[in-house]
Amino acid sequence: AASDVYKRQVSHKGLDLVQAVMDDLMQEDIQLVIIGTGEQNYENMFRSYADQYPEKMSANIVFDNKLAHETYAGGDLVLMPSKMEPCGLTQLIAMRYGTVPIIRETGGLYDTVPALNPETMEGRGFTFKSYNAHDMLDAVRRAAAFYQDSKHWKLLQKNDMKFDSSWNQSVQEYWQIYRSML
């Protein structure tokens, strides 16, 4: 499974969690694509790991919207371990492409990416609650294991691609609440 991290490379995006388990991530059967700019220590870390593991990781320390969309289109997973995320667009864009989110349950990420229940196929991605590197690593491992079941993986991708995050759905929900109050 390929996972990508596309965001501003700053600590509140959870990159300290990624940093804490980078050696473990490099041992998993995944490839990482990093796109974005930010704090120098994270940029340097990603470059260093990309140099050490060129077959496992690509560090693109640039802001390149076209490359980001190409990565969403070609990726399998997007990792968003944010400490806080009031809204979040990355997961919505990723799902539109069929790229499954791995998120920490916070803010807008929690609102838009309910945890997948593999038995019922309800949910839209893989989640972890605690702001903890090993919980994040566990979510990555669960996602990579689920990826091996191609039939269910494709179903999850299709469900994510159909998710309606437009205002149409919100307007309907507000309208129902308004009508119930009359």
Short names for language-model regions:
Residues 8-10, 38:
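Short donor-sugar binding/catalytic loops of nucleotide-sugar-dependent glycosyltransferases
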Residues 13, 131, 165:
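Residue-level signal for the nucleotide or nucleotide-sugar donor/cofactor binding architecture
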Residues 10-23:
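A conserved mid-protein helix/loop that constitutes part of the nucleotide-sugar donor-binding site
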Residues 1-6:
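Short, small-residue-biased leader/transition segments that mark boundaries at the very start
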Residues 65, 70-157, 161-162:
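Catalytic binding pocket for nucleotide-activated donors in carbohydrate/polymer assembly enzymes
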Residues 29-68:
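Nucleotide-activated donor-binding/catalytic signature segment of Leloir-type glycosyltransferases, i.e.
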